Amino acid sequence: CLVGSEMCIRDRAEGVEHPDLEALFTVDEETGLTGAFNLGSDMLSGRYLINLDSEDDGEIFIGCAGGVDTVATFRYREEPAPEGMTWMQADLSGLKGGHSGDNINDGLGNSNKLLTRLLLAGTERMGLRLASFDGGNLRNAIPREAHAVFGVPAGQADEMRRLTGQFAATFAEEYKYTDAGVRLEVREAGKPATVIDAGTQRSLLLALQGVANGVLAMSRSMPGLVETSTNLASVKFADGGRIVVTSSQRSSVESAKADAAATVGAAFRLAGAEVEHGEGYPGWNPDPSSRLLQIAEAAYEHLFGTQPKVRAIHAGLECGLFLEKYPKLEMISVGPTLRGVHSPDERLEIATVDKFWKFLIEILRTL
């Protein structure tokens, strides 16, 4: 869309009044924001930036969330799996999952948090010993599944099964409106060679239970928009006696993003983990009073007789990085309607392209 729009402006806009134009092209937006990260602070001179990366006709985006990863590493001692235990595997499945930005306000279950509730209860009530925990995968996804292998004293195996059934019923009730398919099951497993030491196990489970997850704050400027959130993305056993817990924090307010990451990191540090924060990327705090937004709203209503929806997204856009390099920019993000984005089914709704072209030209003419 960006390339096509720039060509149209150059080739077809004869007679259309508009200010001097600069065209900014970036690379690697989907996988690493490489182009935006490397944008020079002296490359642009304009006051307004119209980002052509939105995916719905009739919507104008004026904000996005920045993000940062927080990774906690627990180091444990391997101990021989004790005798006299019944070994089991617990499987938490059936959750919907979703994007940790777009869907964080949907009240979806987090498999890592739910399975931790069972494991911590088993530890405190019957001396459960943990051999492995594997939950979630992608850092930007709400985890759908989690699995753990553990042992309980043989005489308490039936009690562990009853406890699992109780938690299964609890989760089904708690998430009947959002994750109706949630399942928690336990089955027999082979005896593992080792378990993690009891002290690290307790610290890990208490940290997973206690760490924040979900929406932390709503926007003060845009009703219904999540401002700040955190997602407990994955728990993985790694080589060298390590357990790696990955989480991600998002916010359209840079200071709030930093505070969320610090809060999550503090919880893990208190539990004895080593914590590292990723480089991250900045957000774009919505400005509903922007002159560029007012021009765009008026242009859309003038052309099509209806008001556009003004939105912000709790996910990353390049605009946050643009604003970091050029803090005085006024920005909006618009585009024609796309469906199935980032999949083999990606497609463009052709009927919206002409509307998008007319809308863009009207904005430029009015500036």
Feature annotation, model-predicted:
Residues H147-V149, R183-V195, A233, V244-E254, ...:
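A short beta-alpha structural unit
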Residues L163-G241:
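Hard-cation-handling environments
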Residues N103, N110-N112, R117-F133, G278, ...:
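Active-site-adjacent substrate-binding region
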Residues S41-D42, L108-R125, V152-A157, R202-Q209, ...:
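His/Asp/Glu-rich mid-to-C-terminal helical/loop segments that flank catalytic regions of hydrolases
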Residues D158-A172, D259-F268:
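Short amphipathic alpha-helices in soluble, non-transmembrane regions
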Residues V16-S111, L119-T123:
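Fold-level recognition of mixed alpha/beta catalytic cores in primary-metabolism enzymes, strongest
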Residues C1-G4, I9:
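Single conserved hydrophobic/aromatic residue that forms the stacking wall/gate
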Residues R220, E227-I243, S248, E297-A298, ...:
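Zn-dependent metallopeptidase/amidohydrolase metal-coordination segment
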